[in-house]
C-alpha cells in the first residue's frame, strides 16, 4: 500500500465500543450491527455472538472484551472500516472496559428506555470521558411497553450532561434504528490520528493463549505499521520476538500482510511465556523503537483475596497451570502458592471483586475440570505493630499476636447506589448494618435517588450486593471505588475443632460484632460437620478468649442391647468400657471438615 492509499484507508476507519449497564442490551446491539454489516452468514449467526465463553452466555453477561472488524457501506456511497470492541458492564470488570476504551475514538452509550441511567452506566461514561472519546447516546428497548424514551433522553442530559437531542431511539431486538447508529458512527466518531511512517506503537488490550501459536496479542496500532517478519519489542518487559502472523477478526481470525494506523487486530510471534506480553503494554520495532510507551493503561490492584485449593491434592500442578493460563488474558488475577494445615497445598489468589472471583472459580472447574475448595474471601489490612513496624495482611492466618498490635487499618470504598425512592430506607438500613457512613443523597428525578456511602470493603465482600438486590427487588444498581485506609477495631477470630485450630476457617471481624458472629458460625458448623464417634467441641476464640461454643454429640452404639434386665454392675461395666474407648478415640481422632463448612463462614450474615 502506498502513502496515499494508506491515508485514504485511515480516514475511513472508525474505532468504537459499546458501553452500557448490565442487561441494557449491549450484546444484542452488537449482534444486530454484525448482521447489518453482513459480517456473518445467517447460518453462523447466534445470539450474543461476541460472548464466546459458555459462562458468558449462561449468565447473560459479558466478561472478556472482544474485537471485530466490519465493513459498512454508508449512505454517502463510501465503504468504511468499523472496529467494534465489545466491553463488559459489570463493576468488577471495569478494567476490561478501560482497556477497550483506550483502543477507541468513540463509544456508543446504550441506555435502557425503561430503566434509565444506572450506576455502572455512569461509571463507564466517566471512563470514556477520561479517554476523550466521542459519546453517542442510544436509547434502546423502545419497543417495551414500559419504555419512556423522552424521560430517559432528559435524564441523559441532566445526569451526564450529554446533548441527547440526536440520540438514536432503537430496539436492538427488533432491529429498529441500527442503520441510524451506524451512520452516526461514520459521521461523528473521528478517524484515528496517527502516522504510519512514525516508529511503531501498538497497544495490547487483550491476549489469549493458543497451544500451537503461542500467545496471541490483541492489538490496536496507534503509530507505524507492523508486518509479518518484523522484529518487535515489548516495552514493559524488554523481550524481543519475530512476528509470525498478523490479522484481524471478522469475527473469525483472518490473516493480513500488515496492520497499520487505526487497525485493531491480532499479532502472533511464537511467544511461549505468558508473562512476556502484559496487557496494556506497548509493542514497538526492535530496530527503530518508539521513544516512550503509550499512556492510558494502569496496573490494577486486586481488592479481594481468597485461597483456592484442589480437592484432590495431586492436582496442585494442574491448578497452577490453569491459573497461569487464565492470568494470561486476565491481567488483574494474581496468585501465589500457600499451604494450609487443613487443606494442604493451594494458592492465595487476588481478584478485583466477588463476581470476578466466582467466575475464575467456575472457569477453573469447567475448562480445566479441577474441583476446588475456596476459603473465605478477605481484603488487605494494614497492621501497625507496637514496635513501629507496618505489615500488610491479606490472609487472616498471618495476623500477628493481638498483644503486639498497635492499630489495624482496613480499606474503605465510596459506594454510589442508585435506587428508586421507595427503597431508600431499606438501602440505608443495609449500609448502616455494614458499618457504612452516610455521605450524600441526591435526587436524579422525582423517582430515583443516588445515595453515597463510605463502607469498609470487607463488609461489601461478603454479600452486600445480594442483600442490596433482594431488598430492592433488583432495582438498585451499585458502583464502588477505593478511597483509602481508615483505622478500625478489628480482631482475628479463630475456630477450634476438638481443641485444634482450623487455619482455613479463621477470619477478621469488627470487635463489636465478634460475639454475634462467633455464635452464628459455631451453630452453623454444628449443623454441617457430620457426627463423629466421639464428642467434638466447636469453639470460636479471639486470642486466648473463647467467645462461643457448641458441641457435636457423639454417635453411640447401644452397648446394653444384649443385657436382659439383670445386674446393674454388668451394665455399668459396659458403659464405662464404651466411655473409655470414646475418650481414647477423642485424643487421637481428627475431624473431617466438609466444603460446606468453609462456605458457611462466608454466608453467615444471612441468618443474622
UniProtKB/Swiss-Prot annotation:
Which InterPro entries does the UniProt record give?
Answer: EF-4 (IPR006297), EFG_III/V (IPR035647), EFG_V-like (IPR000640), EFTu-like_2 (IPR004161), G_TR_CS (IPR031157), LepA_C_sf (IPR038363), LepA_CTD (IPR013842), LepA_IV (IPR035654)
Which E.C. number(s) belong to this protein? 3.6.5.n1
PROSITE patterns associated with the record: G_TR_1 (PS00301), G_TR_2 (PS51722)
Q: Which Pfam families match?
A: EFG_C, GTP_EFTU, GTP_EFTU_D2, LepA_C
Which subcellular locations apply to this protein? Cell membrane
UniProt enzyme class: hydrolase
Q: Which reaction does it catalyse?
A: GTP + H2O = GDP + phosphate + H(+)
**tr-type G domain spans which residues?**
11-193
What Gene3D superfamilies does the entry give? 3.30.70.240, Elongation factor 4, C-terminal domain, Elongation Factor G (Translational Gtpase), domain 3, P-loop containing nucleotide triphosphate hydrolases, Translation factors
GO CC: one term? plasma membrane
Which topology term describes how it sits in the membrane? Peripheral membrane protein
Q: Which GO terms describe its biological process?
A: positive regulation of translation
What keywords sit in the KW lines? Cell membrane, GTP-binding, Hydrolase, Membrane, Nucleotide-binding, Protein biosynthesis
Q: Does the keyword Amino-acid biosynthesis apply?
A: no
Q: Does the keyword GTP-binding apply?
A: yes
From the UniProt record, list the coiled-coil ranges: none
The UniProt annotation places GTP binding at: 23-28, 140-143
Task: Show the GO MF annotations.
Answer: GTP binding; GTPase activity; ribosome binding; translation elongation factor activity
Purpose of the protein: Required for accurate and efficient protein synthesis under certain stress conditions. May act as a fidelity factor of the translation reaction, by catalyzing a one-codon backward translocation of tRNAs on improperly translocated ribosomes. Back-translocation proceeds from a post-translocation (POST) complex to a pre-translocation (PRE) complex, thus giving elongation factor G a second chance to translocate the tRNAs correctly. Binds to ribosomes in a GTP-dependent manner.
Family to which this protein belongs: Belongs to the TRAFAC class translation factor GTPase superfamily. Classic translation factor GTPase family. LepA subfamily.
Question: Which NCBIfam families did the record assign?
Answer: lepA, small_GTP
- Name listed for the protein in its UniProt record: Elongation factor 4
- Organism for this UniProt entry: Bacillus cytotoxicus (strain DSM 22905 / CIP 110041 / 391-98 / NVH 391-98)
- Protein's gene: lepA
Amino acid at each position: 500500500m502506498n502513502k496515499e492509499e494508506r491515508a485514504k484507508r485511515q480516514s475511513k476507519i472508525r474505532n468504537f465500543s459499546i458501553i452500557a449497564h448490565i442487561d441494557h442490551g449491549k450484546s444484542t446491539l452488537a449482534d444486530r450491527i454484525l448482521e447489518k454489516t453482513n459480517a456473518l452468514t445467517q447460518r453462523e449467526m447466534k445470539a450474543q455472538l461476541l460472548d464466546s465463553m459458555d459462562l458468558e452466555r449462561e449468565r447473560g453477561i459479558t466478561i472478556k472484551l472482544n474485537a471485530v472488524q466490519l465493513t459498512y457501506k454508508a449512505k454517502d456511497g463510501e465503504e468504511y472500516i468499523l472496529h467494534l470492541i465489545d466491553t463488559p458492564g459489570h463493576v468488577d470488570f471495569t478494567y476490561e472496559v478501560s482497556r477497550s476504551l483506550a483502543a477507541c475514538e468513540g463509544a456508543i452509550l446504550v441506555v435502557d428506555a425503561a430503566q434509565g441511567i444506572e450506576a455502572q452506566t455512569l461509571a463507564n461514561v466517566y471512563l470514556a470521558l477520561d479517554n476523550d472519546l466521542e459519546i453517542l447516546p442510544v436509547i434502546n428497548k423502545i419497543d417495551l411497553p414500559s419504555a419512556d424514551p423522552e424521560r430517559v433522553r432528559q435524564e441523559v442530559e441532566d445526569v451526564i450532561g450529554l446533548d441527547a437531542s440526536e440520540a438514536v431511539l432503537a430496539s436492538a431486538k427488533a432491529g429498529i434504528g441500527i442503520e441510524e447508529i451506524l451512520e452516526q458512527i461514520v459521521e461523528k466518531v473521528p478517524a484515528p490520528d496517527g502516522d504510519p511512517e512514525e516508529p511503531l506503537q501498538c497497544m495490547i488490550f487483550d491476549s489469549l493463549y493458543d497451544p500451537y501459536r503461542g500467545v496471541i496479542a490483541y492489538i490496536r496500532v496507534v503509530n507505524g505499521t507492523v508486518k509479518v517478519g518484523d522484529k518487535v519489542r515489548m516495552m514493559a518487559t524488554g523481550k524481543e520476538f519475530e512476528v509470525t502472523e498478523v490479522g484481524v477478526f471478522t469475527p473469525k481470525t483472518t490473516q493480513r500482510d500488515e496492520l497499520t494506523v487505526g487497525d485493531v487486530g491480532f499479532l502472533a510471534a511464537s511467544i511461549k511465556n505468558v508473562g512476556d506480553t502484559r496487557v496494556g503494554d506497548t509493542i514497538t520495532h526492535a530496530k527503530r523503537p518508539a521513544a516512550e510507551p503509550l499512556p492510558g493503561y494502569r496496573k490494577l490492584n486486586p481488592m479481594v483475596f481468597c485461597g483456592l485449593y484442589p480437592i484432590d491434592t495431586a492436582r496442585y500442578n494442574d491448578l497452577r497451570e490453569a491459573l497461569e493460563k487464565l492470568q494470561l488474558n486476565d491481567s488483574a488475577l494474581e496468585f501465589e502458592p500457600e499451604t494450609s494445615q487443613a487443606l494442604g497445598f493451594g494458592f492465595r489468589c487476588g481478584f478485583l471483586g466477588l463476581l470476578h472471583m466466582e467466575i475464575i472459580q467456575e472457569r477453573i472447574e469447567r475448562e480445566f475440570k479441577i474441583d476446588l475448595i475456596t476459603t473465605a474471601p478477605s481484603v488487605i489490612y494494614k497492621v501497625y505493630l507496637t514496635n513501629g513496624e507496618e505489615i500488610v495482611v491479606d490472609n487472616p492466618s498471618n495476623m500477628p499476636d493481638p498483644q503486639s498490635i498497635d492499630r489495624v487499618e482496613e480499606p474503605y470504598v465510596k459506594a454510589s447506589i442508585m435506587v428508586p425512592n421507595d427503597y431508600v430506607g431499606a438501602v440505608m438500613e443495609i449500609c448502616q448494618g455494614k458499618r457504612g457512613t452516610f455521605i450524600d443523597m441526591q435526587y436524579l428525578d422525582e423517582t430515583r435517588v443516588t445515595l453515597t456511602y463510605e463502607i469498609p470493603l470487607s463488609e461489601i465482600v461478603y454479600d452486600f450486593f445480594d442483600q442490596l438486590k433482594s431488598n430492592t427487588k433488583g432495582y438498585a444498581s451499585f458502583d464502588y471505588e477505593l478511597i483509602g485506609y481508615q483505622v478500625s477495631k478489628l480482631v482475628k477470630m479463630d475456630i477450634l475443632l476438638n481443641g485444634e485450630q482450623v487455619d482455613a476457617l479463621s477470619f477478621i471481624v469488627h470487635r463489636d460484632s465478634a460475639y454475634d458472629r462467633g455464635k452464628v458460625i459455631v451453630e452453623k458448623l454444628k449443623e454441617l460437620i457430620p457426627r463423629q464417634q466421639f464428642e467434638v467441641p466447636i469453639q470460636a476464640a479471639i486470642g486466648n478468649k473463647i467467645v462461643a461454643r457448641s458441641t457435636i454429640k457423639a454417635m453411640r452404639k447401644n452397648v446394653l442391647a444384649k443385657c436382659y434386665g439383670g445386674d446393674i454392675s454388668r451394665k455399668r461395666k459396659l458403659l464405662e468400657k464404651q466411655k473409655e474407648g470414646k475418650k481414647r478415640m477423642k485424643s487421637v481422632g481428627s475431624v473431617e471438615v466438609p466444603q460446606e463448612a468453609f462456605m458457611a463462614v462466608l454466608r453467615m450474615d444471612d441468618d443474622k
